[in-house]
């Protein structure tokens, strides 16, 4: 079994991604052909469930873009279900400390290395027990990315990085800026300093740093600092802003009173 996304991170090859929030397999397939290295299927803030994640995984599968799935929480039951439908790479939100990071890793591993429940006869991941020795191969194919998005998590970054089985650490700029007192302003100098320091620290520890940033200059800055998986846009934002721009060219008035950024 292979995980191309995990292999790319291990090799130090930067991966450029797009966030999927439309919760739709048709749009997921459309974007899978756009040329991004990875696509994030968001189960935290988008209206996804196990069934909609499954159909998006199926839609993306024929394309080179690699799927990354974010559950709504660091919950072993939810993680088990997502792995069984075929997710191999998970982005676990709001991880605050090393214990929570260890719990995330354990949820992705079969015993004795972890606590993932065995149900491979029912699972797309094992191709319904058609993958020989799946139970012994699956653990090494899992890629665990944890999200740090508060000052508390930042203060615990060193111990999180020491957890075996963590492949990457994703900095959540929206929640981090809010926690630091700069809600809606992830480009504030204090937030940017925290992000840049974290990227350097994560890479120095031999892990892959990641982030979502639609500002092209900042995204390139993070890549220069060593970020290895960077999402550079969100499908809902691309659709909304693109539609508004087209309407505006024909005289429509935009109502952007609630717009506060890409995410």
Curated annotation (Swiss-Prot):
Catalytic reaction equation(s): 4-hydroxy-2-oxoheptanedioate = succinate semialdehyde + pyruvate
The keyword Metal-binding is assigned to this record: yes
Gene Ontology CC entries for this record: cytoplasm
UniProt cofactor note: Binds 1 divalent metal cation per subunit.
Amino-acid positions noted as binding a divalent metal cation in the UniProt annotation, renumbered to this chain: 149, 175
Single GO term (MF): 4-hydroxy-2-ketopimelate aldolase activity
Active site: 45 (proton acceptor)
Entries under SUPFAM superfamilies matching the protein: Phosphoenolpyruvate/pyruvate domain
Positions contributing to substrate binding: 147, 174-175
Domain of life: Bacteria
Pfam families: HpcH_HpaI
Cofactor: a divalent metal cation
HAMAP family: HKHD_aldolase
Functional description taken from the UniProt entry: Catalyzes the reversible retro-aldol cleavage of 4-hydroxy-2-ketoheptane-1,7-dioate (HKHD) to pyruvate and succinic semialdehyde.
Alphabetical list of PANTHER family matching this protein: 2-KETO-3-DEOXY-L-RHAMNONATE ALDOLASE (PTHR30502), PHOSPHOENOLPYRUVATE CARBOXYLASE FAMILY PROTEIN (PTHR30502:SF0)
Protein name in UniProt: 4-hydroxy-2-oxo-heptane-1,7-dioate aldolase
Source organism of the structure: Salmonella paratyphi A (strain AKU_12601)
